[in-house]
Regions:
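Positively charged, small/polar-rich N-terminal and surface patches that mediate targeting and assembly
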Residues: 1-108
């Protein structure tokens, strides 16, 4: 099993913990993510329509592999409340091989 380019973290910001939980539950239930981690409260500072925003958001991190990521991204876009959701695909360059095997086995 090659680690490079096979496993990914999906980094997603959501409007609140409930939205993150809904997306995570659905993704894991549909075997598109092995697991999700939710950071319930963080502060996000950004510009939207040229206006400075300072919002409370939640962070959702989902663990997946290359074959499941396209469907996972599609699901997030469909379930997300934002007009332009933050969805970032972060490659996992290395990790505990047993854990990475568990990710793969969980996505079957």
């Amino acid at each position: 099993m090659s680690v490079t380019r096979n496993f990914f973290l999906a980094y997603i910001t959501t409007k609140n913990e409930e939205e993150a939980l809904n997306i995570a539950n659905f993704a894991v239930e549909k075997n598109l993510a092995a697991c999700g981690n939710i950071f319930p409260k963080m502060k996000s500072i950004y510009k939207w329509n040229k206006k400075l925003q300072n919002d409370d958001e939640s962070l959702l991190i989902l663990k997946t592999n290359s074959s499941k990521y396209p469907l996972l991204k599609k699901l997030i876009i469909e379930k997300h409340s934002y007009e332009v959701p933050c969805i970032l695909k972060i490659p996992i360059d290395d990790g505990n091989k047993e854990y990475l095997k568990w990710i793969n086995d969980s996505l079957i």
